[in-house]
């Protein structure tokens, strides 16, 4: 397999948090690649350590300059097999890896995928909502006013909507979403999850107003937010979470 991928950039999906979800092909590529490019030093080091792989690697993240991206692109096309991983899930989706992909393609290099977990797909699949059509919005603006405008625009077609947010901003975003839904007179159901695949995973399905009642009690975590299609409603509230947070005993698993 390595010979067949000489000179290629392979985007390798890693787990969303549970290392048990890593595929055998991903392990093989991580172990035998000539060049490895990660997103953050600590996360990539932890991944390699969990696999008992000792390997040096380069970084491509939000701090990587355009000049450094060009340099990495040249390294890829001049090397053997290069693997790109992100901190979680599939690289190239809402992370700086997409810039490297574009650079490699501009230089005539090959880009291939070793697919696996992806957070928005996992959340959408367990939401219970209709999945066709859906709109993936990535991360919204940091500014509340701009964010509300974005939410209004994404919700207008009536599709199922999926977006990411940071652990530090998701509570403000959910409150903005509530304001937009009230302003537009829509009563759409949501699916909200934190820390997918981990023991601390938290899920909520139902009306956003019900989630807001307990929002301040929720911990920091990596969220995915799914809004149902316009005609799809859920009147029944449903919470679920892992066993390691006894303070949430009232939430049903």
From Swiss-Prot:
Protein purpose: Catalyzes the 2'-O-methylation of the ribose of cytidine 1402 (C1402) in 16S rRNA.
Pfam families in the cross-refs: TP_methylase
Cited PANTHER family: RIBOSOMAL RNA SMALL SUBUNIT METHYLTRANSFERASE I
Protein name listed in UniProt: Ribosomal RNA small subunit methyltransferase I
Keyword NADP in annotation: no
Reaction(s) catalysed (UniProt annotation): cytidine(1402) in 16S rRNA + S-adenosyl-L-methionine = 2'-O-methylcytidine(1402) in 16S rRNA + S-adenosyl-L-homocysteine + H(+)
HAMAP family, sorted: 16SrRNA_methyltr_I
Keyword field contains Cytoplasm: yes
Entry's Gene Ontology molecular function annotations: rRNA (cytosine-2'-O-)-methyltransferase activity
Keywords: Cytoplasm, Methyltransferase, rRNA processing, S-adenosyl-L-methionine, Transferase
Stretches for region Disordered: 230-253
Family: Belongs to the methyltransferase superfamily. RsmI family.
GO CC entries: cytoplasm
Domain of life: Bacteria
InterPro entries: 4pyrrol_Mease (IPR000878), 4pyrrol_Methylase_sf (IPR035996), 4pyrrole_Mease_sub1 (IPR014777), 4pyrrole_Mease_sub2 (IPR014776), rRNA_ssu_MeTfrase_I (IPR008189)
Compartment(s) where it occurs, according to its Swiss-Prot or TrEMBL record: Cytoplasm
């Amino acid at each position: 397999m390595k010979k067949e991928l000489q000179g290629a950039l392979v985007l390798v999906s890693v787990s969303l948090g549970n290392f048990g979800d890593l595929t055998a092909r991903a392990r093989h590529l991580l172990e035998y690649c000539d060049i490895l490019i990660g997103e953050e030093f600590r996360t990539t080091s932890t991944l390699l350590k969990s696999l008992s792989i000792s390997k040096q690697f380069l970084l491509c993240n939000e701090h990587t300059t355009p000049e450094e991206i060009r340099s990495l692109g040249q390294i890829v096309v001049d090397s053997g097999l290069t693997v790109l991983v992100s901190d979680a899930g599939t690289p190239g989706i809402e992370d700086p890896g997409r810039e490297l992909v574009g650079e490699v393609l501009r230089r005539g290099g090959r880009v291939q995928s070793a697919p696996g977990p992806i957070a928005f797909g996992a959340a959408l699949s367990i939401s219970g909502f209709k999945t066709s059509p859906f709109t993936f919005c990535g991360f919204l603006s940091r500014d509340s006013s701009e964010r509300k405008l974005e939410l209004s625009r994404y919700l207008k077609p009536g599709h199922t909507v999926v977006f990411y947010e940071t652990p530090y901003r998701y509570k403000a975003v959910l409150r903005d979403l509530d304001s937009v839904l009230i302003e537009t007179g829509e009563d759409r159901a949501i699916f909200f999850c934190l820390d997918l695949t981990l023991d601390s995973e938290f899920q909520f399905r139902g009306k956003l107003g019900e989630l807001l009642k307990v929002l301040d009690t929720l911990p920091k975590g990596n969220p995915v937010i799914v809004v149902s299609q316009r005609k799809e409603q859920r009147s029944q509230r449903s919470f679920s979470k892992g066993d390691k947070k006894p303070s949430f005993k009232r939430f049903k698993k």
